[in-house]
Amino acid sequence: YFLLIPSQLKRFIELVFEKRAKKYFRNKYTVSLSTSLRFYDHTAHNYLHGICDDLNMRYWTDYSADMQDLMDETQREKLLVFAEEFFHAVASRLPTTKVYDPVVTRRFTYKAGDVKEKVDNNGRRILILTDLEKEKSNLGRMIDQFKNSFTDGVEIANINDIEIKGGCIGCVQCGLDNKCIYMGKDGFIDFCEETYFTADAVVFAPEIKDRYFSWKWKQFLDRNFYRGHTPGLKGKQTAYILSGPLKQLENLRQIIQAKSEMGYTNLVDIVTDESENDKAIDRTLYNAARRMMWCDERQYVKPPSFLYVGGHKIFRDLVWSRRAIFQADYKYYRKHKMFDFPQKDKKAAAFNKQMMSLMKDPKMKEEIRKMMKTQAVRPHMEVVAKE
């Protein structure tokens, strides 16, 4: 469940707050346990920890297991030790440490100004995807202001208008050929294939609920897994328009950035109303529109960070080792040469073999040690000199 928890559990958490049921959780000891491939398991645990702190629970710790750990005796023993410590903490009423402060929301009404000079769409189809419930809200007004920044406007799609029968159930049947169990039973896949993935640029404008977005938004993202680990928006420009305290939700910011990088998209900006300054919000919305078209014209996607590189290696190894299950992913990875295992780098292998052979001689090893700094930058200096 990409970067967080299943939408079904997210719905439960929202109901706890909606039904004012926090009192039933107060001072209860708790842990969070996950089984996954350890792909952004930390963001899921961070979210749950924050929610437990909001509920004034006694959060002890988290436990992140691989999906196959139960089959390993050593890992089973480790799980028992984890449980033993937790039960001891409960029985002994040991103190716990709160990590997350309550999220503070402010009352500010954004009033959009006039757009004096509009950004040329250049014939590109821009889609704003939202789950907006109240049009006369800050988020609604920000969406309108962004839309009015373009010469030809933008298309707006509300996921609440999409027929979605249910959330992803994690059956992984789609791994074989990208065929979801809901196929033909609701309108989700048709929307994705005909509207969402065909857009030239996408702006996400979800409503912030507790420490993430809404459960409906998470349901939409979870259902996207029918494509497995193959990207649907590769090479496209994306941006976020948010109303709420993003500066207090660093975990959510990392989730947004990770989703963008793992989707091979270029995240232009995340625009919020936190400045509580109408003109500043107008400027950032307009600048996001301008940058989106500027980057689109140049087909620019910024280089990935650890958020992608680490995630890619996990997915690469998963698809390779379980290609009998993820057949559709395997075909995509193979076609796009994404099985970039280091042992396949013949040039690096030849270099390492030669250098290790040379350094068996102690004198040569010392000579190479002296040259390491200058030789490391020499090829780069040659490129700079040519430019």
What is each PLM-predicted segment?
Residues 1-18, 81, 87, 96-227, ...:
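N-terminal beta1-alpha1-beta2 submodule of the flavodoxin-like/Rossmannoid cofactor-binding fold
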Residues 1-58, 183-263:
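Helix-loop-strand module that forms the ligand-binding subsite of alpha/beta enzymes
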Residues 9-18, 22-106, 140, 144, ...:
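Extended, hydrophobic interaction surfaces within ordered domains
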